Amino acid sequence: MIERFGVSRTTVRKAIENLVVRGLVEIRRGRGTFVAQPKVIQELTELTGFVEDMQALGRNPTARLLDGQLVPADADVARQLAVSPGSLVMRIQRVRLADGVAMSFDETYLPREIGEKIVTHDLESEPIFSLLEERYNLPLIEAEYRLEAVTATPTVAQALAVEPGNPVFLIERTSYSSEHRPIDYEKLHYRGDLIRFITRLSRRPRARS
């Protein structure tokens, strides 16, 4: 680039730094500088699953199943699913991809009686939300979202093909069926460089003093 455009190394470095700040390129340690993937814009305005979100954006969603097994519920999982700490729940780990690019590492926790049914299906092609609602008649009525910026643990980094310590969005989502019954608790780790979340807020009328 220096020879082609007849500029100094300092000028090239500053230009690349500017492109990184603008999110147009990314620097990968030991590999070089690459054009950045365009960010997926995801609205947090209704309860939807990954497949529904990506299809709405014209992306091709796929999944890679890493694990599905019964594990003892820790205090957090037990609280979210309203079960006793230490009781067995189903944990399902998947990598979610859009157009072949890893977007999210998902950990899904289900009550044992539901989870043992869900894992008998092909979870690389059948969305869990669809199975719950259409196969097992468990309509998802509402969910609670908790969004946090965190750094990738070695496990998350390996799943998403990023460096440990890279920024990721962590969404904790508890979905409820009828009578406010929690049936699905998820920890969704999204690559921070590939997604942007937006929402719309309305202001409640205030009483005039």
Language-model regions, residue ranges each:
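N-terminal helix-turn-helix
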Residues: 1-37
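All-alpha effector-binding/dimerization core of bacterial HTH-type transcriptional repressors
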Residues: 37-209
